[in-house]
């Protein structure tokens, strides 16, 4: 998944839940700028940050590991 697509998913879910960037920022401890940059695909967040955001937004993430031939 591309960072832009990830950001769109996070932003769309946040809006469905009627949450502000500020509220998401308070929960995750990330700055509003960082949340905005993630939503706009301007940064590539670490997996632990994505996990924390997904937890708050009640989203599930599935990681699939495949062997490259």
What role is predicted for each listed range?
Residues 1-5:
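A detector for short, charged/polar N-terminal pre-domain segments
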Residues 8-25:
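Short basic helix-loop element that most often maps to the first helix and adjoining turn
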Residues 9, 23, 34-37, 49:
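Residue-level recognition of specific faces of alpha-helices
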Residues 29-43:
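Recognition helix of helix-turn-helix/homeodomain-like DNA-binding domains
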Residues 48-64:
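DNA major-groove recognition helix of helix-turn-helix/homeodomain DNA-binding modules
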Residues 67-69:
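Short acidic DE-rich linear segments
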């Amino acid at each position: 998944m591309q960072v832009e697509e990830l950001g769109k998913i996070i932003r769309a879910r946040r809006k469905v839940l009627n949450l502000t960037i500020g509220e998401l920022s308070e929960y995750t401890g990330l700055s509003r700028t960082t949340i905005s940059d993630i939503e706009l695909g301007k940064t590539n967040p670490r997996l632990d940050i994505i996990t924390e955001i997904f937890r708050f937004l009640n989203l599930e993430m599935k990681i699939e590991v495949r062997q490259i031939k």
